[in-house]
């Protein structure tokens, strides 16, 4: 029997910025283009998943981002205790998607092969391509691999009935992962 999921968007951060800061190489039409930061909860009757882990207060301060609430607090607002989360899906390893290393102590992390290859490979030899990554996030994921807490996916994988991960055709780069819940009963913004 397949599950039906509710999708929650949990806003945890904000950055007042201009368009120049949103695009590699800048934007000649610079103007205000603020950015909000979200993690997602995919909540089923039988099982729930966290999609991306956000960043914590020290990382936000380092990168001059406003932390509106800690990710764990936002999850608790919808009834999810981070200590009991069993599955986390990481879309990609940018600092705002893969931080909070110890927030989910029991979780198994789902990650695309291509993403780990990208953030540990030759692309990181280029300073401009490293900007959205934090070495601590990458090494924390390597530690999770050695602790048998990472499940790698190569393209489309069903991780639960009606829930798949896949390599997205991303504007950022081809290695990003995208989850897709085929059956969503409702979508709520929190």
Feature locations, PLM:
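A short secondary-structure junction signal
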Residues: 100, 120-123, 176-178
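Conserved beta-strand hairpin/beta-sheet module of binuclear metal-dependent hydrolase folds
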Residues: 12-77, 177-190
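Metallo-beta-lactamase
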Residues: 69, 74-80, 84, 114-167
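Active-site environment of divalent metal-dependent phosphoester hydrolases
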Residues: 16-18, 57-58, 93-99, 117, ...
């Amino acid at each position: 029997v397949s599950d039906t999921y509710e999708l929650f968007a949990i806003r945890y951060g904000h950055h007042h910025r201009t368009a120049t800061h949103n695009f590699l190489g800048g934007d000649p039409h610079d103007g205000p283009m603020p950015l909000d930061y979200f993690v997602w909860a995919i909540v089923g009757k039988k099982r729930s998943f966290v999609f991306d882990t956000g960043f914590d207060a020290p990382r936000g301060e380092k990168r001059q981002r406003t932390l509106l609430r800690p990710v764990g607090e936002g999850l608790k607002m919808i009834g999810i205790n981070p200590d009991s989360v069993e599955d986390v899906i990481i879309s990609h390893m940018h600092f705002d998607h893969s931080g909070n290393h110890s927030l989910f102590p029991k979780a198994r992390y789902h990650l695309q092969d291509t993403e780990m290859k990208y953030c540990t490979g030759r692309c990181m030899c280029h300073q401009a391509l490293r900007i959205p990554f934090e070495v601590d996030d990458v090494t924390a994921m390597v530690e999770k691999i050695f602790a048998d807490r990472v499940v790698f996916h190569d393209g489309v994988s069903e991780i639960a009935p009606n829930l798949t991960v896949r390599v997205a055709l991303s504007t950022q780069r081809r290695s990003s992962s995208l989850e897709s819940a085929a059956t969503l009963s409702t979508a709520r913004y929190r």
